[in-house]
């Protein structure tokens, strides 16, 4: 038994060495450097002064608040909207393959290109969006220049971009549901809404959990789209 344990341990050694070199050592080095002030020539140990200065920054609270609003709204809307789109795309429609391709298209475009395109579309005077709304709204809306609208404008673009991946995950989860559940429900006289909330939604929970995690993490670490816009 001891020989078998030693034999299996030797197989773990290469992975442990790689993990140590790639993760543990850089993490410890980063923590040490965070407590110093240096310019690649001279360095001085400062303890927790850098952390105190960071958390005493006035704009930190605003940044954290906006980041949480961004992550919660983008992930929440993606989770709900992508689910209903996936339900529609897995239904009995003739053009569902074409529509799935259209839904997935935003994921093929780079984030910077999307940001630049929507920045042009949201221009207060020359933008396509304001031109389309000119029939209903007389004043020009400054989508990205107004502090009250800028965050929500970028949130809308992020939702448009991220719906594709969320929908694909939902489609895969819904298609993996055993069809016998739906057949049994139809025999019992269940309608479409009852099957949706009693069968599809509960059994698609693993896919929903994946969408929630990926969308929320993506919202927290989003930078390129915000920078581009």
Positions of predicted regions on the chain:
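A structural signal for multi-pass alpha-helical bundles of membrane permease subunits
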Residues: 3-229
């Amino acid at each position: 038994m001891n020989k078998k344990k030693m034999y299996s341990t030797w197989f773990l050694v290469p992975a442990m060495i790689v993990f140590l070199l790639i993760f543990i050592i850089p993490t410890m080095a980063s923590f040490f450097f965070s407590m110093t002030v240096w310019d690649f020539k001279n360095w001085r140990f400062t303890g927790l002064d850098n952390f105190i200065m960071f958390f005493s920054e006035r704009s930190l609270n605003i940044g954290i608040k906006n980041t949480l609003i961004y992550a919660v709204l983008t992930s929440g809307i993606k989770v709900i909207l992508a689910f209903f789109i996936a339900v529609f795309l897995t239904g009995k429609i003739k053009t569902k393959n074409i529509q799935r391709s259209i839904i997935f298209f935003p994921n093929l475009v780079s984030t910077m290109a999307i940001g630049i395109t929507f920045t042009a579309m949201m221009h207060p005077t020359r933008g396509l969006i304001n031109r389309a709304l000119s029939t209903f709204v007389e004043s020009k809306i400054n989508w990205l220049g107004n502090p009250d609208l800028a965050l929500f404008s970028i949130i809308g673009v992020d939702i448009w971009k991220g719906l594709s991946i969320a929908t694909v995950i939902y489609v895969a989860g819904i298609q993996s549901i055993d069809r016998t559940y739906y057949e049994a429900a139809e025999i019992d006289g269940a309608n479409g809404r009852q099957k949706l909330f009693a069968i599809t939604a509960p059994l698609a929970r693993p896919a929903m959990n994946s969408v929630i995690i990926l969308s929320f993490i993506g919202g927290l670490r989003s930078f390129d789209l915000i920078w581009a816009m």
